[in-house]
UniProtKB/Swiss-Prot annotation:
Keywords attached to this entry: Chaperone, Cytoplasm, Disulfide bond, Redox-active center, Zinc
Protein name as annotated: 33 kDa chaperonin
Subcellular location: Cytoplasm
GO CC entries: cytoplasm
Protein species of origin: Bacillus cereus (strain G9842)
Sample GO molecular function, one term: unfolded protein binding
Stated family: Belongs to the HSP33 family.
InterPro entries listed in its UniProt record: Heat_shock_Hsp33, Heat_shock_Hsp33_C, Heat_shock_Hsp33_N
Disulfide pairings: 237-239, 270-273
Pfam family name, one: HSP33
Modification note: Under oxidizing conditions two disulfide bonds are formed involving the reactive cysteines. Under reducing conditions zinc is bound to the reactive cysteines and the protein is inactive.
Function: Redox regulated molecular chaperone. Protects both thermally unfolding and oxidatively damaged proteins from irreversible aggregation. Plays an important role in the bacterial defense system toward oxidative stress.
CDD domains associated with the record: Hsp33
Principal location: cytoplasm
Amino acid sequence: MKDYLVKALAFDGEVRAYSVRTTNTVSEAQRRHDTWRTASAALGRSLTAGTMMGAMLKGDQKLTIKVEGNGPIGPILVDAHANGDVRGYVTNPHVDFEGTEQGKLRVYQAVGTEGFVTVIKDIGMREPFIGQSPIVSGELGEDFTYYFAVSEQTPSSVGVGVLVNGDDSVLAAGGFILQIMPGAQEETISFIEDRLQKIPPVSTLIERGLSPEELLYAVLGEDKVKVLETMDVQFNCTCSRERIESVLISLGKTELEQIREEEEETEVHCHFCNERYKFSKEDITNLIENL
């Protein structure tokens, strides 16, 4: 099954809902960064939330999420675009902890329970929108829920889950975001709160093979949900050799000549996708000649 996202309304417009399958997306991130189990879960949850938050934007708008906790995983960075493209990385991918007796990974131990979630939105204005909230649990779903309440004043529920196999490969990933719209009735809010208390963990629902639509039906009730749009989502990095060449050219002739003199081979590393671009002395000479 391919990864895709669903945008929906529920309860006659009182609730805005997003749901996504990110199994392939998170698998690609795990493959590129060689993340261990708990790191995979933390990065996967962040990518999943970022994918849905990116889908709230329009056109060529994009956002960056930084989760900076006090845990050993270090900062998590995610870039997400309105078109469903997402990329991300963890600073220390080789972090893992024993799970609970129920098999749940202790993501909070990797992320940390103190720090901040920062969201930077590039929405075409002169200055980007920057929102920030403290980490409240380190489990990430609760942290993004709190972010929406504090920074965007939008009552929300964020559920994100990643299932990881013993060999570190990703079995399933996905999640949902529910947002209460202004004027929603108390009965609607109470109904959703009650359902959220009763449903299994998101990762369990995903493991059962539920599609994004079925995930929303499980949370809200099939008769309450009206799907508006679906869109493909994927791990996609914007880096390329041509872009790296442009960055090198921007350094100027003097610095490029110094690089050519000092380095047999120049390597540029993209943190987001882990690609490495190598430039020989001859490559650097060609760049200098094109200045």
